[in-house]
UniProtKB/Swiss-Prot annotation:
InterPro entries: GIY-YIG_endonuc, GIY-YIG_endonuc_sf, GIY-YIG_UvrC_Cho, RuvA_2-like, UVR_dom, UVR_dom_sf, UvrABC_protein_C, UvrC. NCBIfam families: uvrC. Gene3D superfamilies: GIY-YIG endonuclease, UVR domain, UvrC, RNAse H endonuclease domain. The gene is uvrC. Residues 15-100 form the GIY-YIG domain. This is UvrABC system protein C. PROSITE patterns: GIY_YIG (PS50164), UVR (PS50151), UVRC (PS50165). Belongs to the UvrC family. It is found in: Cytoplasm.
């Protein structure tokens, strides 16, 4: 592909809304953008005389990107709003080199009350509850469970979803037995109203907890006192000290961005009844050679936090500063929720002051991050191995099996200088050799990029063959992910382990590297590999125990080892065997054997 081909492709652009994609010489996706008019928007990136080149009026980031571009593709849409939604989906799924990806795929809990119930109670949800008389509080970015426990401790509300007679909570004076009509609905709702007020004012709960902690300590019940102390610390963290009087009991949200020293900080305030009830902040390292795009960040931030499957608590959003697609986002959100949603930039007054406060906190978070986290090793890896991304988010893969038995794969995740165990993954595998097993694991992960965004780096436990395999899968996915592999040094075709430290080689797309065993880069990659290995081995051992147990059950039914292996080869695992359709089993191993399996 050449610049001449690109010039011809530019001539095919239509005058309609859509999404455009830029690719480099290797076919790697560089950038995804949206346009109201594809022809006008894409051509604005280029100058055409004397030859096709980057438009010097654009930023250095854009010029650098265009110099790398040799091919473009586009998808037309019915409207610019549709194009924006598709653009956001592509960025999240494919992680293009010149787009910034906010890595926050978590859903946060809400506390809610269902007033359709005769005696409503507090519950936790992460999704929209499809009922008409629901009151939501949140989202709570931490501490939701601690808040709920404190509410039930001090307000004698119904705790069990279904209860027909007084339960243990009534006996210990933690419930007034509404199930047995020992309290009227009117009186019960008065108590509930007090509890909801406390939920919006955590200092009320903290005072009660501090009294309880003191009593426990005086009674020398130090273990329980320590638990209450931890609960107090968590709830105190929820409180935001704001010297701004939000006079009206309003519900709204505030978003602010800050960028400094290659760090992007995003901050979100959730305000209910005039109180800031929760704060969420996120730090994203940005590649040094790429300038940040506030319009792109605000779009991602707001679209992700106002998705259709979570409750809408506020129809007004305040942002610290203007951004290009603000009005378009208003249109999208208003259509999404079938009501008017406003995105505003306040100029004066309390709303302006709270937006300024959000921005100041975003800057402070960058300072804290730089003091608490050292990204030196990531920068060294990027420079030494010529990676495209700063490897802040790393996924590490390993497989484990014993002579083709209990075949499993594992993925561990290292993010922002710590293990992110919420993103660890386990895989039951069908194949028996290392190469096909790794293909199976990597393919399954790549197919999930639309749900869990790709990382900056894949680290594979293996040699060049597995590195090339990973490259093939990443290229086919269209995602922008660097790849490294780590393998034992081989002597006479056998992996060599030196006493006092394994001799490891690092494989990259640029070549093979032998680093000193004292090299910090090698030690860091070994640490990552060892955690993946530990996780895979542990999963393999547990799987093997379960398989041995299940195998003994089938042996007790009179099945031979040959029949059991035949079933496993076909179904992959014992759970699938037990769930299999009788007809399918009968065709595979005969009716008598199938009947034994289904009856037991």
């Amino acid at each position: 592909m050449t610049k001449e081909n690109l010039e011809n492709e530019l001539k095919t652009l239509p005058n309609s809304a859509g999404v455009y994609q830029y690719f480099n010489q290797e076919g790697k996706l560089l950038y995804v953008g949206k346009a109201k008019n594809l022809k006008n928007r894409v051509k604005s990136y280029f100058a055409f005389t004397p030859n096709l080149h980057a438009n010097p009026r654009n930023s250095l980031r854009i010029q650098k990107m265009i110099e790398e571009t040799v091919h473009l593709e586009f998808i037309t849409t019915n409207s610019e709003a549709d194009a924006l939604i598709l653009e956001n989906s592509f960025i999240k799924q494919l992680h293009p080199k010149y787009n910034i990806l906010l890595r926050d795929d978590k859903t946060y809990p809400y506390i809610y009350v269902d007033f359709e119930e005769e005696f409503p109670r507090f519950e936790i949800t992460r999704k929209l509850v499809k009922k008409s008389k629901i009151k939501y509080f949140g989202p709570f970015f931490k501490g939701a469970r601690e808040l709920l426990d404190a509410l039930y401790l001090y307000y004698p509300l119904k705790q069990k979803a279904s209860c027909k007679s007084p339960c243990i909570f009534y006996q210990i004076s933690r419930c007034l037995a509404p199930c047995d009509k020992r309290i009227s609905r009117e009186k019960y709702l008065e108590i509930l109203d007090e509890a909801m007020h406390a939920l919006l004012n955590p200092s009320i709960l903290i005072k009660n907890l501090e009294k309880q902690m003191l009593v426990l300590a005086q009674n020398e019940n130090y273990e329980e006192a320590a638990k209450v102390r931890d609960q107090i610390v968590t709830i105190k963290d929820l409180e935001v000290k704001v010297e701004i009087d939000i006079a009206k009991l309003e519900d709204f949200e505030v978003f602010a961005l800050a960028f400094e020293n290659s760090m992007l900080s995003t901050l979100r305030f959730v305000v209910q009844n005039g109180k800031i009830i929760s704060v969420n902040s996120k730090i994203t390292p940005i590649k040094n050679d790429i300038q940040w795009d506030k319009n792109e960040i605000y779009k991602q931030l707001i679209l992700e936090n106002f998705s259709m499957d979570i409750p809408l608590l506020a129809n007004v959003i305040y942002v610290y500063e203007e951004f290009e697609d603000r009005m378009l986002l208003e249109e999208i959100l208003s259509q999404r929720f079938d009501k008017k949603i406003s995105i505003k930039i306040p100029k004066i007054g309390e709303k302006r002051r709270i937006c300024d406060l959000a921005f100041q906190n975003a800057l402070l978070n960058i300072e804290k991050e730089q003091k608490n986290h050292d990204f030196t090793i990531q920068k060294e890896l990027k420079s030494y191995f010529e990676l495209e991304n700063l490897p802040n988010d790393i996924e590490i893969f390993d497989n484990s099996h014993l002579q083709g038995v209990a075949n499993v794969g594992a993925m561990v995740t290292y993010s922002a200088n710590s293990w992110d165990k919420s993103k660890y993954r386990k895989f039951h595998l069908k194949h028996k050799n290392d190469y096909d097993q790794m293909r199976e694991v990597l393919m399954r992960r790549a197919l999930d990029f639309d749900k869990i965004p790709p990382p900056d780096l894949w680290l594979i436990d293996g040699g060049k063959a597995l590195l090339d395999l990973a490259k093939e899968i990443i290229v086919s996915s269209g995602a922008n992910v660097d790849i490294l592999a780590i393998s034992k040094e081989k002597i006479d075709a056998k992996a060599h382990r030196a006493k006092g430290g394994a001799r490891d080689k690092i494989h990259s797309l640029k070549g093979e590297f032998s680093l000193s065993i004292n090299d910090k880069k090698l030690q860091f990659l070994q640490k990552l590999r060892d955690e993946a290995h530990r996780f895979a081995i542990s999963f393999h051992q547990n799987t093997k125990k379960k398989q041995d147990l299940n195998s003994s059950k089938l042996v007790n039914l009179g099945l031979s080892s040959g029949v059991i292996q035949k079933l496993l080869a076909y179904y992959g695992n014992f759970e699938s065997i037990y769930k299999a359709d009788f007809k399918d089993l009968a065709m595979l191993v005969g009716k008598k054997v199938a009947q034994k399996i289904k009856e037991n």
